[in-house]
Regions:
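Hydrophobic faces of well-ordered beta-strands that scaffold small-molecule active sites
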Residues: 40-44, 107-109, 151-152, 231
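Active-site groove signature of glycoside hydrolases
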Residues: 1-2, 90-122
Length: 233
């Protein structure tokens, strides 16, 4: 929905509506969603940026990197350094802008790469500064937009921890939506965390063909009832 995002190689970090995809803006889509009796949600990945983006071209110094070394890409993207006050301000202002402009009830906050280009000897406390800034942003959003639910996601369940549980409404615990596998994933999750915070989607994806055929829909829904169920593609 944003920037020049036609693949995972470009546009990440440019959080403005793509006019080719939405010539009438997001409002038309939001109105259609509301007409169907649903609230509107949006996917964002505020911590990452593509090298091929207006944001990175304007601020190449905003990413985590080690002096004298070429920064690493994962999934064709760098990681913004939230430990820099100007980056923290940018992310918070961007999210405030979206939530003040559009009738958004839900944000899926994704994070699709590991934190590389940091080490204690060369960038002391870089991880801590990043996470504390993330917490400040989430705390501010919760205070200013109490009716907006944020789901924490990170390549699956890499963001499941107590710090995020305090600040988000739900966790995306795994990209694996196979109902048989989910029974084990969900059991492990609920040993520590509340089932109501666990997103459990029913999808039309076949089960692992090496072991099982396509699962019965009733089975899929029964498995999803172990947490907060949803329906996805």
């Amino acid at each position: 929905w944003f920037g020049a995002r036609y693949s995972d190689r470009a546009g990440l970090g440019d959080w403005t509506v793509n006019p080719e995809k939405f010539p009438n803006g997001l409002e038309e889509l939001i109105d259609r969603v509301h007409a169907l009796g649903m609230d509107f949600g949006l996917w964002v990945e505020p911590e990452s940026v593509n090298p091929d983006s207006d944001l990175y071209r304007a601020h190449p110094d905003w990413i985590h990197k080690l002096d004298g070394r070429e920064p690493l890409t994962q999934r064709n993207q760098y990681l913004l350094d939230f430990g820099k006050p100007e980056v923290e301000r940018f992310a918070l202002d961007m999210l405030r802008g979206l939530l003040n402009t559009y009738a958004i009830r839900y944000l899926k906050w994704d994070m699709n790469r590991a934190m590389t280009d940091v080490c204690e000897s060369l960038t002391p406390f870089a991880r801590e500064r990043h996470v504390l800034a993330l917490y400040r942003i989430l705390d501010a959003l919760e205070k200013e937009f109490p009716d907006v639910d944020i789901e924490a996601c990170s390549g699956g369940g890499a963001r499941v921890d107590l710090g995020m549980a305090k600040r988000t409404a739900q966790f995306w615990v795994s990209d694996n939506t196979d109902p048989f596998d989910r029974l084990f994933i969900q059991e492990g999750y609920t040993l520590m965390y509340a089932p109501m915070m666990m997103s459990c989607w029913v999808t039309d994806t076949p089960a692992d063909g090496r072991r099982r055929g396509r699962a019965d829909w009733r089975y899929k829904f029964h498995a999803a009832m172990g947490g907060t169920p949803g329906v996805g593609a």
